[in-house]
Amino acid sequence: MFFYTSTSFRSSISKLTRKSKDGYESVVKDVCDALGSMDDSFLRETNDRIRQEQNFRIVKLRVKNSHQNLPKNDAFRLIYWVSTKSDNLVLLSIYPKRGPLGINNLTNDEFKRLLEEMLREKCDSILQKVDVADNLKVIDEACSW
């Protein structure tokens, strides 16, 4: 599976890592551990599907917050777009369920905005390819597939 990040995801993860005193400092490791421990078919076929089309799905994945030792249902929500036709997965957003930056759920308009932004960034070749085995290290700054 090839992993990419959108601008919204990079902004979300940056905001969370700056709030280390609020218990979010493990977010990068937790995302990498969650994605690295799942096989491609699981990432495509399971989890909470938010939207499903012929060529892609938008999925919500519960990610454990290892720093706060919370159960997955109280930790992070990772929103991603995954192709059903290729090995491409784009991280769209992440947010905590609890804490000062906690969000209960994203609205339909927010999901629509994330999808539109990702499609625009794909066309403009500004998605970043990352390595989930190396703490989301950027492999390619401006890429398209």
Locate the predicted segments by residue.
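Enriched for short, Lys/Arg-rich terminal
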Residues: 66-145
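N-terminal targeting/export leaders
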Residues: 31-43, 55, 133, 141-145
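Acidic side chains
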Residues: 30, 40-44, 48, 99, ...
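N-terminal "first-domain core" detector
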Residues: 1-37
